[in-house]
Amino acid sequence: MACCGGGRGEGAAATESEAYLEGEAVREARELVAELCRHFYGQGWVTGTGGSITVKANDPALPLADQLIVMSPSGVQKERMVAEDMYVLSADGKVLSSPVSKPWPNKPPKCTDCAPLFMKAYLMRGAGAVIHSHGMETCIATMLDPGAKEFRMTHMEMIKGIKGHGYRDELVVPIIENTPYEYELTDSLAEAIAAYPKATAVLVRNHGIYVWGDSWINAKTQAECYHYLFDAAIKLYQLGIDWTTPEHGPINSAKRPRSVLSSSIPNGCPDSKSSKHCVVLDIEGTTTPISFVTDVMFPYARDNVRKHLTSTYSSDETKEDIKLLRIQVEEDLKNGIVGSVPIPPDDADKEEVINALVANVESMIKADRKITSLKQLQGHIWRTGFESKELQGVVFDDVPEALKHWHASGMKVYIYSSGSREAQRLLFGNTAYGDLRQYLCGFFDTTTGNKRETRSYFEISQSLGVDSPAQILFITDVFQEAVAAKSAGFEVIISIRPGNAPLPENHGFRTIKSFSEI
């Protein structure tokens, strides 16, 4: 019997031993899941038999990936859960232990419908626990902007409770569309997990949220923070306050009435005729000289990649970077990409692994590849450079004034660059003009899509919640990006800066040499 499909791992035989299955680790995990179910019922997260929880049965003698899994059942009242109600699964999803049937009116035992989704978090993120909540705030948070593919928030205290985030960071949670049956969400959840490598949660529109962590404590803590932040966003929305910007000013440039139940906003919804305008900026050759990126940023990453990998090799962040690089290199080797070399397995000598990683990264940098695995690692290396003051962000002189002007006029400004979101924030947060992030509302990178593909700009327009893509101005120096954005309905201006590549004759786009011309 299998709760969900999956190949058998090398540690399967060991994890299925009778001693482990009947041992203290599994017993404690059963009791823990039952306790958490009862606790979350009181929070309103798992009422009406909805929602579910799963944890790994912690055995220090086994790698996390090989540990047994305990899952709550389906159809059992969460406030009455006991350890004996739990299912125990192998690391690859095979049911090893099922609860016994209870007399009427109890339903026959059944493993949670969330099982295949839980397994995606275990296999793709190396999770130690996953929580699925139906908390009301998780549903309403996805309704604030029905067209948005992401929930975004910044400058809110509890953001720092989310792994990899601080108070000033922008929290981005992907939103997937709901389906009639839970198992039908499996593929879209997996796609969201793959597309958002820094995310520790996925929202399901009008449904709930999946949250994972490397332990049950981490998953629980993050789940509590997410629920707090969603509740805060809902309350800020009711007050007409924008939760997506650092200053948390009035929504829609103070044009929205103070009461969301104003007669001018039927049923508390913003006037569909109200006009929203956004500016989306490229970085290289638009806000920043290409020479700064090619002559300063790239060489710094190239020259420090070995030092960075060596000093941080055992950190969770670098392990995730290496994991993404492995996936990319395997694909590159299949496609015959020049400069790609095999990366030894994790249990190989550290220096051998690092040597292979350095060779691949140097080749990627030389080819100026716009791939997420490289950009994420570069961002982490640059962070060290900015923190040590070895690096300082460079922008053209006209950029700060334009950002201030747009900000003061209520225009929302976003960045879309092939560099990681972290790298973007580092650049604008550490300039000779001070921290310019206060004028920016969000950051997009290649996790949104390739900058030369029209669908990427369609995704951005959906995230920004405008009534029409034509309400977005995109400024770039790259002709192919301009064409893609225009095809998505954006207004487009091409930036002419020193060092930029020449444009085709009769390209048909408006051009500027300074933001002051806009």
From Swiss-Prot:
Coiled coil: none annotated. Pfam families: Aldolase_II, Hydrolase. Zn(2+) binds at H132, H134, H207. Keywords: Amino-acid biosynthesis, Hydrolase, Lyase, Magnesium, Metal-binding, Methionine biosynthesis, Multifunctional enzyme, Zinc. GO terms for biological process: L-methionine salvage from methylthioadenosine. In the N-terminal section; belongs to the aldolase class II family. MtnB subfamily. In the C-terminal section; belongs to the HAD-like hydrolase superfamily. MasA/MtnC family. It comes from Oryza sativa subsp. japonica (Rice). Gene3D superfamilies: 1.10.720.60, Class II aldolase/adducin N-terminal domain, HAD superfamily/HAD-like. It comes from the Eukaryota. Binds 1 zinc ion per subunit. Binds 1 Mg(2+) ion per subunit. Substrate 1 binds at C114. Its EC number is 4.2.1.109, 3.1.3.77. Residues 279-518 are annotated as: Enolase-phosphatase E1. Pathway: Amino-acid biosynthesis; L-methionine biosynthesis via salvage pathway; L-methionine from S-methyl-5-thio-alpha-D-ribose 1-phosphate: step 2/6; Amino-acid biosynthesis; L-methionine biosynthesis via salvage pathway; L-methionine from S-methyl-5-thio-alpha-D-ribose 1-phosphate: step 3/6; Amino-acid biosynthesis; L-methionine biosynthesis via salvage pathway; L-methionine from S-methyl-5-thio-alpha-D-ribose 1-phosphate: step 4/6. The active site is at E157. Its cofactor is Zn(2+); Mg(2+). SUPFAM superfamilies: AraD/HMP-PK domain-like, HAD-like. GO terms for molecular function: acireductone synthase activity; magnesium ion binding; methylthioribulose 1-phosphate dehydratase activity; zinc ion binding. This is Probable bifunctional methylthioribulose-1-phosphate dehydratase/enolase-phosphatase E1.
